[in-house]
Structures are given as structure tokens and as C-alpha cells.
Amino acid sequence: MDALIRAGSEIDAHDTALRGPLPPEAPLAMPEQSFAAAPDREADRAAAAAPNEWRRLAIMLATAALTCAGGYEMYQVLQVGGVTILEGIVLALFAALFAWVALSFVSALAGFVALLSGWHDDLGVAADGPLPAISNRIAMLLPIYNEQPQAVFARLQATRESVELTGHGAQFDWFILSDTTDPAVWIAEEKCYLALASSGERLFYRHRQFNHARKSGNIEDWVKRFGAGYDCIVILDADSMMTGEALVRLAAAMQRHPDVGLIQTLPIVVKARTLFARLQQFAGRMYGPMIASGIAWWHGSESNYWGHNAIIRVAAFAACTGLPSLPGRKPFGGHILSHDFVEAALLRRAGWRIHMAPTLPGSYEECPPSLLDFAARDRRWCQGNLQHAKLLKARGLHWVSRLHFLTGIGSYITAPMWLAFLVAGILISLQAQFVRPEYFPKGYSLFPDWPAQDPVRAAWVFAGTMGLLMMPKLLALILVVIRRESRRGFGGAARAAAGVVTETLISSLTAPVMMIFQSTAIAEILLGRDAGWNVQHRGDGAIPLREIARRYAAPSWLGAVMAVSALLVSWPLLLWMMPVILGLVLAIPVALLTSRTLAKHRAGAMLATPEDAEPPILSRAGEIAATLRDASPAEDPLLQLRNDPVLRELHFAGLAHQPARPRGRVDPALALARAQIDDAACIAEVVDWLDPREKHAVMGSRDTLQRIMRMP
């Protein structure tokens, strides 16, 4: 297999280029949906979900009880001497934030009890045992955008080989759906495709010249062209993988449950190479299964979709999830960015059940290597989630789907709310320190009004809030420790506990900076700034010191100002704010520490996870990536097409599937490129004169590219 991947035979590569990178089309209509009118449903396919209502009632009642208790205690803290306007603001912010914390705690507690009692997902997707037989046709879709091709294709090939080992490989077709705009990356993708296509059939590659509607438009284009040929699709991310066993079990579950439209798995973070990524890997593996089981337990057939590592019924997806553009200008209008939540809501609106399989192993992903990379991705997600505010009143949605929208919005707006809570607390302290109080109100009174708060009760409120935040970590640790296999995977009880402490301490230092980043993102969005579609950085987290200093300067200065201000007021205020101040003041050294690449043995020793003993699919992906990387030339993409007839033949075969340019519409980059080509005497001048955007336009124009290929 490695020999085929390394070079392939000239005959196989030539045959691949001749037959083209795509199968015959099987069109499927995907009508645009309306949020103003609910569709007519022949029957509610999710009627069996009624037993879940008592679970949801229990979750909501417990959350409400905790929120009322916390709000009452905070009121008792503030009401001594009467509640001022500032104290009223603090109370309102505290109640909203405490409700968020309470819901997270109650949901995690439900997951703890569910896993402790042996609960599995409602569909019975078995984690082990004999593999079931499947007869449905599955399309594996990998949408990519300017990614590192060798790593992306290696992950897909490792997944593909894993499926072949199950004996069900004939049921799966594999599609790489490229929206790449970098011409060098485009050519590298085609070379990787040639290398892998010669090692087996049913692997296809499609490149879109114009990436309309980004990822959702990429998937929609495939559905409209090929969707009728398949029963289900599995959407992968550029950094995700799934084992063959997991995919076969998901396909079998879709066969057994014809009323299910989507099943979401829990992707486990793997292959972390920096301390920041390692913290995410440890936290996801330690706490993720319990948290996911909790939400799956009470979400039931109204679960959510996270955009990848999920199986979807094609007919349902096509009929129900054609996304319109939102009215208004960006960032709130335009194409829907966080389309996954919306697609799940539309499927459920049409009566299809949406489930989660949180205990199914074999679903993996990687994560950004540094906090800056995480924040860059988070900025796009923030804008997409805030767009959902426009959809809360969409007709026909299930109330749990609306709750998904609200929790997605809340995951970002809580950051500026925490910031406002801190600022209001500082202002109350300043008011007490510098504003002369009115001891005797207007009118007759025997007793003065002493402005004060109850410090003892305040300490208990703080302790209770911290307890709700920390308890899910402790519950997850208990689940790991009491299970022999899990305990061994984390390196034993002591190392697991040490990992929880380490993750908690470092995460506490990075949380204030993330609060500032998210608050800034909210402000930018409200000011009308669009996130765009930037290339996501993967791999190591190496960031120049100058860049770290520039990006973290504002949080660091803010922390210093807060520290000095608190110290001028009182030592107790400084101590109360110390967790936030430390995270901000130490932002630059913490960023340097967490973005540093770790030696493999050090990472495993500090924050061990079961995936440190790499599953075969992970090690195989690394082997394939190394092979593909060794075969990648650094030559200009136009020269590679000129010098490699097989690559050129494949490229032109792919252009045959490009949609025709509408009459009267001019591509400015292509027009500029053609003008320069007219002046060029040879291909070397074309290569030298054209910028990447113009080369991309030329490589998508069959006639123009043929002209260049004929130049001396």
C-alpha cells in the first residue's frame, strides 16, 4: 500500500486522470427553506420522544431551583441597607450567569448518574460486539479550504483503510470537496488525489472555483449533483477521522431507525502537540463523555449537530435544510455561518429525530495549537452563533431547538456579562470608598441607613458558585477512577487527579484572556465587522514573541490597571479580583508557555489520556502523511501542470465539471491575468507576473490555461 501511495504506477495514475475525478451525477433537489412558515408534516416522526419530557422537566426544575437559591443568597448579600442601582445591576447579572452555571452543572450531574447507572444512547448504538450488516450506500464528504493537503488526505485515507478492514468498504464512496483558493494548495490536493486514487476505487475529488456560501454551500452543491445516489452522508472536518467500526455501527443504526435524520458522535481530541492543545485533549477526554452523555440524556431526539463526525440521511437533509440567506448586511445578515445548529433545527422541524451517540468510540478530531488560533476560530463561531438570534422566532421549531440557539448565543455573551459583573463589583467598592453615604434619609427617621453588604454570606455565595463550576470535574474524575480500564488509560488515579488539577489551574489563567477576546469579538460584531473566512492554523503552535506581545498587550495592560485600581481601593478587593488579574497580567508568559511544542513523552507524562497509546488509525494517518509529504515538489503550480501530463489531464478533467460562467459577469482577477498573458512572451513571465489570486482564476479557466500550457 505504501508503494502505491508513494508513487503509484504510471498506468493507474493515467487511468485515474482519464476517467476523471468524479462519478456520474445523480441530482437531488434541495429547495430553500422558509423561516417565516412551518412546513406541512405528514406525521411527527419523533412522537416516540414524549418520555424525554420528564427528563427535561427535571433538568429545568433543578436549574430553576439552584438559580432561585443562588439569586436569593446574593440578594441577601446586597440588601443590607437597601439595594442601590449598581447593586441591582450586579444582582441581575449574577442571576443570569448563575443560571448558566446551574444548567451546566445539572446537565453534567445527569451525565454522571446516567453513565454510573449503565445508560446508553436511546438508539442503542453499540460500542462493541459483532459488527452489524449494512446495505445502505454511504457517501463520506470531506469539505476543505486551503488546508495542508498531505495531512488532510492522510486522515481520509486512514479512515478509508479502516472501513475496508471491516469488510463493508463497498458501501462507502469518498468525496474530497475542495473550496481552496490558493493555487499551490489546489495543485497539491490534485497530486495527493492521484497518489491515493491509484490505491483503490470510489475516491473522488471536486474543486469549486467560486466558494458560494462557504462550507454549507459546498455540501449543498454536492447534494444537488450527487445526493440521489446515496442513502446517507457522513461529513468529516479537515482535522477529523473516524474508525471503520464506528462508521458501520452508525450506518446500521440509520437502517434500524428510518425515522432518524441525524446521529452526532462525540469527537475526541487527539495528536495534541502543544501544551494548550494538550489541555484541550485532556479536558475533552476527561469531562467530555460525561457532559455529552448528560445532554444526550435529556435532549433525546432533539439533539444537536456539530457540523462534522455525524451521519445524516440524505433525502431528509435535501428536503429540509436548504438554507436561505439572512436579511440585512453582514455580520448578522448574509449566509448562515453556524449552519449546523440550523440544519439540525430544520430536520427536527420536519419531524426527523436527531440523536447523539456519546459513548460510541472511534470518532476523533484535532484542535487549534494555541489560544490565539483557538480565538481566531472562535471569532467566526461567535458571529455565526449570534446570527441565530434572528432565528429564535422561526416558525415551527421545537422548543429544544430554540434552546440550542440560546445556549449557543449564551456561550459567547456570557463573556461580556462576566466582564460587566466584575466592573460593577469594582464600582460598588469605589462607591463605598469615595462616595459620601447619606446616613439619614429625607423625612423623619429614628435610625440611620448604613450602606453595607454581608461579607460572610458573600463568601458563601462565592464558594457555592465555585463549587458548581468545579463539581463536574470532580464527578468526571470519579467516573474515571472507579473504572479500571479508564483509570489505566489516564495513567492511574493519581496521575488522573494531577491532570485535573493541572488543567484547572492553567485553564483558570487562560479564562480571563478568553473573556477579553470574546468580549472584543462581541463588540466587533455589534460594530458590523465581519469575521471573513480565514485559513485555520493547525500543527504546532509556534508564534513569534512579537506577535504574542502585540496580541496580548491589551489584556496585560488591563490586568495591570485593574490591579492598581483594586489596590488603591482596598486589599480585600485586590484579593477578590486576584484570579482574574493574575490571568490578565500573566497573559504573555502563559501564552508563550502554552503555545510551546511538547515532547511526546512529556505530554503523556503530564496530561495522560487513553489515546496516548495511539489507535491504529492515528498512527496510520501519520505514516501516510509522511509518505505524501516526501513526494511533494515546491515548483510553481503552473509549471507543475506544464511538466506533468498526468496531473494536467486530471486538472482539465476536473474543469469539465465546473459550472459555466453567467453571461455578462466578469471575473476581475481573470481579466487582469489575461491582459498580462497577452504581454507575456513565455510561460516563465506568466509565472513571474501573476499573483496567487490571478493564478487561481487562470487555473479555473480551461481556455486560458490551455493557452498558457502551449506557451514556450
From Swiss-Prot:
Enzyme class per UniProt = transferase
Topology of this chain in the membrane: Multi-pass membrane protein
What this protein is called in its record is Glucans biosynthesis glucosyltransferase H
Main localisation, per the record?
Answer: membrane
- Under which EC number(s) is this enzyme classified? 2.4.1.-
The record's section on CDD domains has:
Glucan_BSP_MdoH
Q: Where in the cell is it found?
A: Cell inner membrane
Q: Which domain of life is it from?
A: Bacteria
**Family matches, as Gene3D superfamilies:** Spore Coat Polysaccharide Biosynthesis Protein SpsA, Chain A (3.90.550.10)
**Which InterPro entries does the record match to this protein?**
Glucans_biosynth_gluTrFase_H (IPR023725), Glyco_trans_2-like (IPR001173), Glycosyltr_2/OpgH_subfam (IPR050321), Nucleotide-diphossugar_trans (IPR029044)
Key word Acyltransferase present: no
Q: Which GO terms describe its biological process?
A: glucan biosynthetic process
An example GO CC term for this entry is:
plasma membrane
Question: Which UniProt keywords are present, listed alphabetically?
Answer: Cell inner membrane, Cell membrane, Glycosyltransferase, Membrane, Transferase, Transmembrane, Transmembrane helix
Q: Where are the transmembrane segments?
A: 57-77, 89-109, 408-428, 462-482, 552-572, 573-593
